[in-house]
């Protein structure tokens, strides 16, 4: 058993319409952020005769997807009836045999050429569109009028676990022959390829043909048996490659048998899969948390410990805040900063786009809303407002009158019943 790391899937090809660049020129390729980007932008940074860096933007219009076969002569071969009703979506008879034994011995009608056939379709204007199954098989007659995507899946193309990239429903378990759409019980990114013509360079042939459909993580080849296992980085790419390479041939006239691979019993494979899942989860957490917080957790910020030791005491000598208290404080500060930032963005000055009478009306409304100057506004460098200071200046303190002490009467008259007193 031999392990082969395939060469990179992307390559740079120089064309006649490519402008000549200086040796110190750098290229930055960017794609429009629209839902259906019809044009692509290429930024060229070069140095002119004066020694200054010049930035040029080259916009190229995306080409439309071309029909892979002639619509007038296109027809699908219906397999021999083995059931009661034929399902055109799965290309099989329901209620009959799972697979015709002669179907696997028939070569595919066409083959997808990504560099030549891919382009934009009607599906690029619809969010959540699926990929064209006939495009993957190389026999789509609609071209730009197709309602499905005509391109390769990327890491940003995420679908529910019970649906594949072509919009077909998965099943609870795999078929006995490991064919079909697959199961939603686990994420399978590995393909089994059988009936390969055995040669000395079988590893290079398998890597060259299967890297066309996406980035490959790992390739295993059993040279003596003519069998290979190809693992893709993305599950959608493995689903696309399975349909694209089914009943195809490599460098010889063999007819490939492409199936889903079973669970690898090797303990190292289980460890690699667990490690990959942990890396994906860690990357998702890194993107969700602030960069400073992630650097502190990973120990990449040496000043974080000093700052926590100083600020975590909360002014109490010898006190060190627990982790939950410190992280709650950091979370509160982070949320407060986000609220301030959001409020600042909402309070940005409004652009004045009115003209003519609308502008005069807007100015009149603003003038009517202004308050009288000295009575309401406060001084910029004082504590009290202008109105308060004016009231204090006009206030005059009157001298308080001395209280008159009450005159005490004779003791003989106290408590007397005589009215003359």
From Swiss-Prot:
PROSITE patterns: RRM (PS50102), ZF_C3H1 (PS50103). One of its GO terms (biological process) is positive regulation of RNA splicing. Its main location: nucleus. It is found in: Nucleus. InterPro entries: Cwc2/Slt11 (IPR039171), Cwc2_RRM (IPR034181), Nucleotide-bd_a/b_plait_sf (IPR012677), RBD_domain_sf (IPR035979), RRM_dom (IPR000504), Torus (IPR032297), Znf_CCCH (IPR000571), Znf_CCCH_sf (IPR036855). CDD domains: RRM_cwf2. Residues 189-263 form the RRM domain. GO terms for cellular component: Prp19 complex; U2-type catalytic step 1 spliceosome; U2-type catalytic step 2 spliceosome. It comes from the Eukaryota. One of its GO terms (molecular function) is zinc ion binding. Disulfide bonds: none annotated. Signal peptide: none annotated. A zinc finger (C3H1-type) spans 126-153. Associated with the spliceosome. Belongs to the RRM CWC2 family. The C-terminal RRM domain and the zinc finger motif are necessary for RNA-binding. Involved in the first step of pre-mRNA splicing. Required for cell growth and cell cycle control. Plays a role in the levels of the U1, U4, U5 and U6 snRNAs and the maintenance of the U4/U6 snRNA complex. May provide the link between the 'nineteen complex' NTC spliceosome protein complex and the spliceosome through the U6 snRNA. Associates predominantly with U6 snRNAs in assembled active spliceosomes. Binds directly to the internal stem-loop (ISL) domain of the U6 snRNA and to the pre-mRNA intron near the 5' splice site during the activation and catalytic phases of the spliceosome cycle. This is Pre-mRNA-splicing factor CWC2. It comes from Leptosphaeria maculans (Blackleg fungus).
